[in-house]
Each structure stands twice: as structure tokens, then as C-alpha cells.
Amino acid sequence: VEREVIISAGAFNTPQFLMLSGIGPRDELEKHHIETKVNLPGVGKNLQDRYEVGIVSKLKENIPLIKGMKLRPPEAGEEADPQFSLWLQGEGPYTTNGATVALIKRSKPDLPDPDLLIFGLLGNFRGYYPTYSQDIGKEENIFTWAILKAHTNNTNGCVKLRSSDPCDTPDINFHYFFEGANTEDDLESVINGVETVRRIIDRCGDLIEKEIYPGEAIKNREDIRSFVMNQAWGHHASCTCKMGPSSDLMSVVDNRFRVHGTKNLRIVDASIFPKIPGFFIVSAVYMISEKASDDIIEDAMQDDL
């Protein structure tokens, strides 16, 4: 390698690439008959994410701002979405991120920082699955409260190899609400978030016809607990190649993003966080990318001297 190889494949594929190249936990590599080049036990460990759930309600009538919105391209012969022409002029709801209201709060009053982001979305959003983007706008008069739990405690997720075939997907296990991982507080916080949303809905008067998800069958706190444990999702996977000193056996990169025990190899993506940051990780990813670019340029200039 004339300069460097920089891996930016994300929390799932970055550890997969390393392990396929012989960099990772020795026992995991031997299981797939991969020669160990660098024994780094932390590769693929420490997988973290948020906990999120959605509470979906049917409105008695559509919000005037979104009247006629289809949230999808029109079908053949169908009337065009009136909000699309507004978007072309830089106006209307399509110029926003789709959230109409947001609330940041502490799930418990004794917490040092807010840990819940509760925001209202247009459409039917119950999480991420293959057809979720089509389902969001299938019905009119639907409103979703999304609840996101930040500062999660679970660090027990992991990414492993299914095989030595680079075309095979990695084995990903978040170990959501893993017993013994101090995640009971996380679960209680999400439950508190659901109860907060229901109190908000109760105060909306004639706007809401009924809650359709999880619905009337989910009544008490134990019902909510089961709902959250079965339905929570996340989309901020990170921390599988964490940054730390070489004395930390579970760290993978140093403070300049260089992979321990290697030369000319760096990782620059969300996998390097030791702990998942903030509410949304995108700003933190921008920040580490800026730092990495400075480090790479600085090191390259020194090498050229």
C-alpha cells in the first residue's frame, strides 16, 4: 500500500472486513479457518444502538397543511400531489424533515441529562422493515409519535462472521434488553416515554379518533413492557471497533483511527465510538470524519518530510 487503506463500511461491515482479513478475535477467526494476522478481541464486540418505538393514532380529519399529500409518487392517471409543486418552489411540508413537533425530556427526574426524544411524524411509521416506506403513506389521517431512548446502557451486542465468504452477510445480534447488562433502566425509560405520549394524546381533544398501534389491548405498564421488548428497533448501530489505548484489550483503533497492530490501516465510521453519542449519531460521525481528515493529512505531510 503506497499510502493507507481507510475502512468506512459501518458498524456491521467494518468488523466483517477486518475479520475476513485476519484481524479480530482469534477464536472467531479459527472457527472459520481464517489465519490470524492480528488478534484483536474487540473487533465486532460492544455493538450499541438506540431503542425506538412508535405510537400510531388515527386523526378525525387530516391536518390542513398536509391535505392531499400522498407521500409517494402518483399512480398512472392519478392526480398529482398538490404539495409537490410547492416543494419545487421551496415551500410546503416536503421541505421539512416530516416531524411536526418534538419534545426532549428526562425519563426520570434524577437523570443528569435528557434521554428521551419524542417527535410527531406524519403517516404510519412503526419502524424499519422492507416495505415501511410504502406503508407510511397508504392511509390518510394517520399520525405517529416516535419515541427514541438515548444514553442506552446495553453494550452486549456483537457482529460475527457467518462464514469466510465475503459475499455472506455477517451475523448481527444486538442482544436487546440483555439480562445482566444494566438495561432495565433503558426499558423503564422507554415505557415512561410511551406513557408520556399517551398523556399527550389524551389532551388532544377532538383531534384524535383513536390509537391504532399498539392499540387498546395494551393497557397497563406490564402490557407496555411486553410491547416495547417485542417491538423496539433502532437505526444508529455503532461502536463495534471502538477507539481506545492499546492497553485496553477490547479497543481496536487508537486516537488517530489507526488499527492496533497494523500499519497503514485506519477506520473512519460510527464503529469507532466507545459509547454511542447523543440522540442522533450523524453529527458525531461528521465530527470524527473532520478529525480523521486532519490526522490523515498531518501524518501524510510528516511522512513526506
What is the meaning of each model-derived region?
Residues 119-121, 129, 140-146, 205-276:
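A glycine-rich dinucleotide-binding beta-alpha-beta segment and adjacent secondary-structure elements
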Residues 104, 126, 142-209:
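C-terminal segments that line or cap access tunnels to active or ligand-binding sites in enzymes
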Residues 3, 40-41, 85-94, 145-147, ...:
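Active-site rim elements
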Residues 275-296:
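A conserved FAD-binding loop/helix module that cradles the flavin
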